[in-house]
């Protein structure tokens, strides 16, 4: 077994850029330490090990951010990012209060602009909106979209199982729709997009379904390596098990931590179009951009998800990055990264007007 692990590590190093390999290998090491065999999680140690950055009202590389609690009853917080306003850099400490007191009550903008509601990854268990990797990613989204990003600090498993993350996502969407500054173009609602990676992509899907059910307009969904599963193993799961950072044993642990205690992996949260799932034909479901890493062991599931949406009559664009692994979009050091950022920018612009 040790020899097999060494072969997998060496193969991985030949494909993955060094900085990405180090980053994700460190995550994997810490994740293995934090997960307990009995299904519980070392939360205090996990919080200590998670590299985080504070919000910055004073601009950093042209982007300002601030944290805001949107549901006191569960302590649900979001981090809001926007392009720095003129004069922000000179305001110093005074800028800390201005966004919260004034930005949330700004008058509607004259032109449509994207608002990306983002759900961080971490398999429903790890990371947060303030994790360094996701703070950086959201800043990139602001720059490429010239809009606003609302990153959701949803409740995590195993302390908060299904459907807590979905409920928090829905709360965030409703909150965004209620804010004066989230309006544009003759007082119309701003153009809202749902996005996330890993478990965040899964959350984005389920929030998008609820939005379609309840008549809330979402302009598009952007899913990066969305986390789906099922009881029957796919070809890519068998072929890539343990080869590029992730094992089936890892994935099974996370699903057991998130799903209801008596559920298996064909629960609709995990397998939305599986035997217990629901088809979306006839539903006004938003257009989707689905980013798939060819070396992610769940890539077959993501492609099957896209096929199911198409079969139900929905618009889907799949960008399949054959030689990319999980997390490739976190660092700007591959051709795939730049291609995907361009695809995201094009998708936002194409769906901004309706």
UniProtKB/Swiss-Prot annotation:
The keyword Secreted does not apply. Keywords: Gibberellin signaling pathway, Hydrolase, Nucleus, Receptor. Disruption phenotype: Severe dwarf phenotype with wide and dark-green leaf blades. Plants insensitive to gibberellic acid (GA). GO terms for molecular function: gibberellin binding; hydrolase activity. GO terms for biological process: floral organ morphogenesis; gibberellic acid mediated signaling pathway; positive regulation of gibberellic acid mediated signaling pathway; raffinose family oligosaccharide biosynthetic process; response to gibberellin. Gibberellin A3 binds at residues 122-123, 134, 198, 250, 327. One of its GO terms (cellular component) is cytoplasm. Gibberellin A4 binds at residues 122-123, 134, 198, 327. It holds the Pfam family Abhydrolase_3. The keyword Cell inner membrane does not apply. It is found in: Nucleus. Changing residue 196 to D: In gid1-1; abolishes binding to GA and ability to degrade SLR1. The active site is at residues 198, 296. Its EC number is 3.-.-.-. Functions as a soluble gibberellin (GA) receptor. GA is an essential hormone that regulates growth and development in plants. Binds with high affinity the biologically active GAs such as GA1, GA3 and GA4, but has low or no affinity for the biologically inactive GAs. Upon GA-binding, it interacts with the DELLA protein SLR1, a repressor of GA signaling. This leads to SLR1 degradation by the proteasome, allowing the GA signaling pathway. Interacts with the DELLA protein SLR1 in a GA-dependent manner, resulting in subsequent SLR1 degradation. Belongs to the 'GDXG' lipolytic enzyme family. This is Gibberellin receptor GID1. It comes from Oryza sativa subsp. japonica.
């Amino acid at each position: 077994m040790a020899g097999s692990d060494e072969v997998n590590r060496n193969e991985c190093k030949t494909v993955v850029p060094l900085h990405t390999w180090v980053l994700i290998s460190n995550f994997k090491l810490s994740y293995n330490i934090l997960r307990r065999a009995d299904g519980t999680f070392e939360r205090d140690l996990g919080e200590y090990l998670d590299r985080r950055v504070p919000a910055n009202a004073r601009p950093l590389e042209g982007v300002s951010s601030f944290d805001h609690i949107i549901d006191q009853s569960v302590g649900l917080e979001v981090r809001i990012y926007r392009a720095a306003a003129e004069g922000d850099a000179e305001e110093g400490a005074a800028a800390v209060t201005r966004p919260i007191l004034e930005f949330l009550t700004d008058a509607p903008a004259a032109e449509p602009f994207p608002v990306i509601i983002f759900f961080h990854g971490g398999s429903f268990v790890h990371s947060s909106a303030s994790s360094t990797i996701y703070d950086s990613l959201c800043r990139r989204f602001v720059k490429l979209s010239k809009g606003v990003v609302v990153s959701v600090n949803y409740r995590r498993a195993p302390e908060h199982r299904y459907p807590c993350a979905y409920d928090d996502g829905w709360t965030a969407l409703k909150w965004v729709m209620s804010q004066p500054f989230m309006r544009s173009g003759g007082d119309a609602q701003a153009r809202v997009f749902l996005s996330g990676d890993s478990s965040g992509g899964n959350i984005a899907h389920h929030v998008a379904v609820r939005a379609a059910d309840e008549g809330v307009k979402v302009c598009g969904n952007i899913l990066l390596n969305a986390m789906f599963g099922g009881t029957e193993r796919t070809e890519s799961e068998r072929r890539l098990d343990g080869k590029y950072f992730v094992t089936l044993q890892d994935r099974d642990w996370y699903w057991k931590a998130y799903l209801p205690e008596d559920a298996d992996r064909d629960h609709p949260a995990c397998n939305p179009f599986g035997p217990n799932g629901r088809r979306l034909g006839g539903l006004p479901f938003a257009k989707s951009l689905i980013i798939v890493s060819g070396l992610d062991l769940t890539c077959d599931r993501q492609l099957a998800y896209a096929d199911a949406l198409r079969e139900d009559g929905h618009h889907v664009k799949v960008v399949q990055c054959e030689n990319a692994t999980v997390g490739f979009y976190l660092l700007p050091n591959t051709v795939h990264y730049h291609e995907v950022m361009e695809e995201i920018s094009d998708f936002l612009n194409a769906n901004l007007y309706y």
